[in-house]
């Protein structure tokens, strides 16, 4: 979900219990980018849900961050996607409730009109909110069955709270009163509040602070809540819990912090109604965070609808137009039907539709991803090369007893297929000695089998690592191939080790292009210089020095072309014994070459002198012969002169 670095930053942020909530939230927004908010929120959800954090201040900070991540602004609430007409329009019948209140302060009555949309599975109850005071005491109620309420100082909206003695609960149908209703992390608030309601006081999971604060997140936070530190909120909650003597809603004011926290007591039945309220409105709202990652909200929660009627109930003090459920006419139906909701429906995955997937097949479904068979057209002769060689050997010894194999025998043995299958195994792992000998024998009989083996430059490094001898035998057969340059280039660019040097040393025994071996030596020197680990560097330098000495000793390379580069390499690693030996070897080789050059020059000069002397002697002899011949035959001299 998040890496260890972000997790450490998040845990340090949860420990800042001495800072106000809004400061912590600002630090959170500056630390994590907007694209990571949902991911970090999921991490907070997980550590709270699984109980990885138990300190009350840390849990409060986590709840506040989850609450503030998707707190809607006024501009968002006024947009078309979040308008009250599109969000607050269920499929059930809607009614309007009009209530007249008596003001106890000035003994005058002022009408208060509240238009709300009511879900079909709830009934309205008479409320008596006050429009002047910020905190309502229990004595301000005008009816014994009415629900006490408090005024939210943030939005100046009167929010009812549930009482244990009430039979029904009222839910205000206004998006401004439920900013968390569109928060994808709402299930954690409901689940943790359910734990507190179900847990006893002696239970280790019981936390009176969360039991008091979580209902505020589900409705509306007080005005100065974000300006207080988690420690101050915990102290206020503890004092509020100690001073509460009744089950009705009370307001606690401390002299040091000047903040009011309404003590809301939510029963389990009212929490289920809140769940239904949330689930009814879930399909009508698009969460941008989930839509951006490709999750569409296709799950619609259908609840059975009921019909409602409107009756007028006059009283002595107030005149109220109350909606009464038709179930009240029948005593057997005078109960609210609680629809059981699974915990999975409130989890993250409730936003994503579940598809029924077919059962996996019995065979391994991933075999086709990396096929081990190199498919290709393999044409075999009526008689394979091995069978033909066997017949030829038999014919020399006993020609009258030749048994020609049957067609089934000749077609069942395909040397191309055998070499290709063994090469595929050799690339993936080590072969047995018998399999290595089988590949060598097949390619010795028919060298063209190396072209059908399926070896590519991409697979060559794996073959060198797993089966060095097979790589040597195959490359020796491919040395005249036009693709050999690609193979050797791959061999040069792969990681320098003993196996690759062994392959190059074996290839150096045949006629290679003159630039291949110097190119590989240059690559080895560069690799040694780039190694950071000292021990690994010394080991590689020793290996390279021994390799170059073996090439010089076998007269495979001419050190003149690499004299400066190798000499610099030896001087750089002069503390290594093998480097000193290589330095002496290249100097001795250079001196020997110079001596041989001088000797050859002197020998050539001596040879030229001897040739000149011989020519002079020959000329003298010819002249003497002519004189002798002239004395005997004077006419020949005259003819020769003419």
From Swiss-Prot:
The keyword Cytoplasm belongs to this UniProt entry's keyword annotation: yes
GO cellular component, one term: cytoplasm
Entry keywords, A to Z: Cytoplasm, Nucleus, RNA-mediated gene silencing, Transcription, Transcription regulation
Deleted gene: phenotype: No obvious phenotypic change is observed.
UniProt entry tagged with the keyword Transcription regulation: yes
Compartments (UniProt record): Cytoplasm; Nucleus
Residue span of region Disordered: 78-167, 589-627
Coarse class of the protein's main subcellular location: cytoplasm
GO biological process: regulatory ncRNA-mediated gene silencing
Low complexity bias spans: 589-625
Reported function: Component of the CCR4-NOT complex which is one of the major cellular mRNA deadenylases and is linked to various cellular processes including bulk mRNA degradation, miRNA-mediated repression, translational repression during translational initiation and general transcription regulation. Additional complex functions may be a consequence of its influence on mRNA expression.
Quaternary data: Component of the CCR4-NOT complex.
Family recorded in the similarity comment: Belongs to the CNOT11 family.
UniProt protein name: CCR4-NOT transcription complex subunit 11
